[in-house]
């Protein structure tokens, strides 16, 4: 039986600590690792793909059981290129991360990290999106031991069709109280736009936002991580509201 093959990507870029530390740990623990990641940070780009310019694949590093490539594209591009171009056969599992910053609740709609894992699930490959609390300790070995156990469990048990796992990890230095299987919480952003002027007098804007968390209970990823639990949320990317389908089917609408 050969080594377990892993495709790693992220939205923080190919030189980010999270992806490089995870790649090294998995390589040292018997996995065959391929990294395909954006050449620069592409955070909050959601599920964008590149259609109107060429994609360029650049080898960064190659050694036994570890190959690293950068592309001038998005996280979802990276998954597609990794599967269709770089790897000889589909990986056993796809991991997006480890992201510097949590991706919880409705944040996942904006997240390049989560969208890359969704892209993997679209291929029918088990996929994880993994995020660590911002400025958390990427050298914490307990985090990698946990992730290895989770990978092994996913490969042993499998995941439901069209489902991925969104994993959010508190900073271990603050203490970890355990692991919870959670549901998505709700976060909204109150956007503010700061107006400035360039040297030619033309105005431009920086967008900033204040987070508001609403109606979150103990079952949610948001509350669980706040209380020191690692959150594992199964995400199914069928966005259909089936209750609304039943209701709308009774509407009388004619052409």
UniProtKB/Swiss-Prot annotation:
Record function comment: Nucleotidase that shows phosphatase activity on nucleoside 5'-monophosphates.
Lineage per the UniProt record: Bacteria, Bacillati, Bacillota, Clostridia, Thermoanaerobacterales
Cofactor: a divalent metal cation
UniProt-listed Enzyme Commission number(s): 3.1.3.5
Pfam families listed in its UniProt record: SurE
GO molecular function per UniProt: 3'-nucleotidase activity; 5'-nucleotidase activity; exopolyphosphatase activity; metal ion binding; nucleotide binding
Protein name as annotated: 5'-nucleotidase SurE
HAMAP family named in the record: SurE
One GO CC term on file: cytoplasm
Substrates-to-products reaction catalysed: a ribonucleoside 5'-phosphate + H2O = a ribonucleoside + phosphate
InterPro entries for the chain: SurE, SurE-like_Pase/nucleotidase, SurE-like_sf
């Amino acid at each position: 039986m050969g080594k377990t093959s892993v495709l790693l990507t992220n939205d923080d870029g190919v030189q980010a600590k999270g992806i490089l530390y995870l790649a090294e740990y998995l390589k040292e623990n018997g996995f065959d690792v391929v990294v395909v990641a954006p050449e620069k940070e592409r955070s909050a780009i959601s599920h964008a793909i590149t259609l109107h310019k060429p994609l360029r694949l650049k080898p960064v590093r190659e050694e036994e059981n570890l190959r690293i490539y950068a592309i001038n594209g998005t996280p979802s591009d990276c998954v597609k290129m990794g599967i269709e171009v770089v790897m000889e056969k589909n990986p056993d599992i796809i991991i997006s991360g480890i992201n510097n910053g949590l991706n919880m609740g409705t944040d996942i709609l904006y997240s390049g990290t989560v969208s890359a894992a969704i892209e993997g699930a679209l291929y029918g490959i088990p996929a994880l999106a993994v995020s660590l609390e911002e400025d958390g300790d990427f050298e914490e070995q307990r985090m990698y031991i946990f992730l290895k156990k989770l990978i092994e469990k996913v490969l042993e048990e499998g995941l439901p069709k069209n489902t991925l796992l969104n994993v959010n990890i508190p900073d271990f230095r603050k203490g970890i109280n355990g692991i919870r299987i959670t549901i998505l919480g709700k976060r909204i952003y109150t956007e503010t736009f700061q107006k400035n002027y360039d040297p030619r007098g033309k105005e431009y804007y920086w967008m900033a936002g204040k987070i508001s968390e609403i109606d979150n209970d103990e079952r949610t990823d948001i509350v669980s991580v706040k209380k020191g639990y690692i959150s594992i949320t199964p995400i199914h990317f069928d966005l259909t509201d089936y209750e609304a389908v039943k209701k709308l089917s009774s509407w009388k609408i004619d052409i």
